[in-house]
Amino acid sequence: MKSMDKISTGIAYGTSAGSAGYWFLQWLDQVSPSQWAAIGVLGSLVLGFLTYLTNLYFKIREDRRKAARGE
């Protein structure tokens, strides 16, 4: 049989997750569809920019390795 501390820990985590889920859904209801569209556009632009910076970083590292090897 499970010990009481494991049962109470599970109940506490379940209650916390349920409460967080409830408040998250309440927050989602306050955002209008046009605001979600703006969030989506801005999010995709930020993600594209981060992808560009990551690619640039690894290209610079590759170029430095090639220069160090004399290629």
Swiss-Prot record:
Q: Which GO terms describe its biological process?
A: viral release from host cell by cytolysis
Q: What is its main location?
A: host cell
Changing residue 2 to R/S/T: what effect?
Answer: Decrease in lysis inhibition by isoform Antiholin
**What is its membrane topology?**
Multi-pass membrane protein
The residues on the Periplasmic side of the membrane are 28-37
What spans does the record annotate as topological domain Cytoplasmic, numbered to this chain? 1-6, 59-71
Would you name any one GO CC term? host cell plasma membrane
Gene Ontology molecular-function annotations: identical protein binding; pore-forming activity
In the UniProt record, the signal sequence range is none
Name the UniProt key words of this record, in alphabetical order: Cytolysis, Host cell inner membrane, Host cell lysis by virus, Host cell membrane, Host membrane, Membrane, Transmembrane, Transmembrane helix, Viral release from host cell
Subcellular localization is given as: Host cell inner membrane
Spell out where the chain crosses the membrane: 7-27, 38-58
Q: Which residues form a coiled coil?
A: none
Pfam families, sorted:
Phage_holin_2_1
Description of its domains? The N-terminal transmembrane domain seems to be externalized during the pinhole formation.
Supply the name of the protein: Antiholin
Gene field:
S
